[in-house]
């Protein structure tokens, strides 16, 4: 069982604040049972699951409302209509290309709405890999650059920070 394995591996790790029942798996009884197992094993940490909005019959799966890419105005509206839980964006922007606009709307919402817990950016670090070309010069690679069948192409070439951690790559990086 993945929830028990996750718990046993990480139960004493001080950085674990919230247990997660997964990502983008929709809702349902199995995910709900995972949340119950986390609560049974650990009565002190919260449980998170993003897919509750797709199946409200298991609304108690997550201790907070969690959605992806909901506009700041939509979050504010949801909280006004549903005061019973705080709200967290498990993804609210995707740091790829010329993205991460309107981040200020989310930080402003944090100042206005105490039940808005903030959110997470996908991706923080560029996932490209360094490789030497035939002349010995290093370059960044991604899907298909190793003679393999390309997967998602340059989809991994993203992130707020460069793969070398030497600089921020997006104009909105200072807002993070």
Q: What are the residue ranges of the model-derived segments?
A:
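Extended substrate-binding grooves/exosites of carbohydrate-active enzymes
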Residues: 1-168, 173-174
């Amino acid at each position: 069982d993945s929830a028990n394995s996750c718990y046993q591996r990480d139960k004493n790790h001080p950085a674990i604040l919230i247990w997660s029942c997964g990502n983008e798996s929709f809702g349902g009884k199995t995910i709900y049972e995972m949340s119950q197992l986390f609560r049974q094993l650990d009565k002190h940490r919260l449980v998170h699951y993003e897919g509750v909005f797709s199946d409200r019959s298991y609304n108690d799966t997550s201790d907070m409302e969690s959605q992806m890419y909901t506009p700041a105005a939509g979050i504010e509206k949801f909280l006004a209509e549903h005061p019973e839980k705080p709200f967290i964006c498990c993804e609210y922007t995707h740091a790829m290309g010329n993205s991460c606009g309107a981040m200020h709307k989310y930080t402003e919402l944090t100042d206005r709405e105490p039940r808005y817990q903030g959110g997470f950016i996908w991706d923080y670090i560029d996932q490209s890999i360094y490789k030497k070309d035939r002349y010995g010069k290093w370059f960044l690679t991604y899907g298909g650059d190793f003679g393999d069948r390309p997967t998602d192409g340059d989809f991994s070439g993203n992130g707020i920070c460069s793969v070398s951690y030497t600089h921020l790559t997006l104009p909105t990086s200072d807002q993070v």
